UniProtKB/Swiss-Prot annotation:
Biased segments, Low complexity type: 25-45
Entry-linked SUPFAM superfamilies: PapD-like (SSF49354)
Entry superkingdom: Eukaryota
Domain MSP span(s) in chain numbering: 99-221
PROSITE patterns (alphabetical): MSP (PS50202)
Protein name listed in UniProt: Vesicle-associated protein 4-3
Purpose of the protein: May play a role in vesicle trafficking.
Coiled-coil regions listed in the entry: none
Comp. bias intervals (Basic and acidic residues): 1-14
Gene that encodes it: PVA43
Listed InterPro entries: Ig-like_fold, MSP_dom, PapD-like_sf, VAP
Pfam families named among the record's database cross-references: Motile_Sperm
Family to which this protein belongs: Belongs to the VAMP-associated protein (VAP) (TC 9.B.17) family.
GO CC annotations, alphabetized: endoplasmic reticulum membrane
Species of the source: Arabidopsis thaliana
Length: 287
């Protein structure tokens, strides 16, 4: 009996040795799983905390360094040619520099005489350091012209031009000061690299370099009501006549075509004036 019990005890101890690792593995498996889940939970909490901290810092972070310029790669949608340079942007923000000084500066004054050709005058001075060509443009070329119609001015040179206009008879017995005119004059300028003779084609050939100096609006003055503007107009017209005579004398010895603006009398004005005078005469005869 004792042998049997000892044998069974020894067998139990032997089997116990073999069973011990399995028991330890079974008992340690939940512990490893628990440690893994705790590590995963800890890492997720840490990652979430870092993400929240990064978002919080990025919201309140302000960059105080030099501006970052994005490079243009081959796959960039916008080409470098379409991006304006800093110099072109700066030029677009700056006001246009005038080459000419005008007197009057924005309006052309005419005496209001219906059915007649009237005149105005304007002084033009080159205030730049280069030779400048100028020319007139008008919205009604059939009833207006300028003399001279254009010229090239040296730096500091001044010229006085005469502007001719036919005044339409009033409609519905409108008073002179109520007569509105939609006629406008535009003065264009072109910087010349080298002095040359004036030709109107210059403005078409170099249209990308042409500048608009001023758009002049027409204002009528009552010749029967003396005022400062009317007196100034008379003085400028007398000066323009003297300058015109000087140009004519200077061009008498020139063989070839006359200067631009000379002798450009529009026959349509004569026809309108004759019709207007005929209407006036018809009214007098009827009376």
């Amino acid at each position: 009996m004792a042998l049997t019990e000892d044998k069974s005890d020894s067998d139990g101890r032997r089997w116990g040795k073999f069973k011990l690792p399995f028991r330890n593995s079974n008992s340690q498996a939940p512990s490893a799983s628990s440690s893994s889940s705790m590590a995963t939970s800890s890492s997720s909490v840490t990652s979430s905390h870092l993400n929240q901290n990064y978002i919080h810092q990025s919201r309140h972070f302000q960059y105080h360094g030099p501006p970052v310029v994005e490079g243009l790669g081959q796959n960039h949608h916008q080409s470098a040619a379409t991006i304006p340079s800093m110099s072109s942007v700066a030029r677009s923000l700056l006001p246009t520099k005038r080459r000419l000084k005008l007197d009057p500066s924005a309006k052309l004054y005419f005496p209001y005489e219906p059915g007649k050709q009237v005149r105005s005058a304007i002084k033009i001075k080159n205030t730049s350091k280069s030779h400048v060509a100028f020319k007139f443009q008008t919205t009604v070329p059939k009833s207006c012209f300028m003399r001279p119609a254009g010229a090239i001015l040296a730096p500091g040179e001044e010229i006085i031009a005469t502007v001719f206009k036919f005044v339409e008879p009033p409609e519905n017995n409108e008073k002179p000061m109520e007569q509105k005119s939609g006629v406008k004059f535009k003065i264009m300028s072109l910087k010349m690299k080298v002095p040359t003779d004036y030709m109107p084609e210059l403005f078409e050939e170099q249209k990308d370099h042409v500048s608009e100096e001023q758009v002049m609006r027409v204002v009528f003055l009552d010749p029967e009501n003396p005022n400062s503007m009317m007196e100034k107009l008379k003085s400028q017209l007398a000066e323009a006549d003297a300058a015109d005579e000087a140009r004519k004398k200077a061009s008498e010895g020139i063989v070839g075509p006359k200067p631009i603006g000379e002798g450009l009398v529009i026959d349509e004005w004569k026809q309108r004036r004759e019709r207007y005078l005929a209407q006036q005469q018809g009214g007098v005869d009827a009376a």
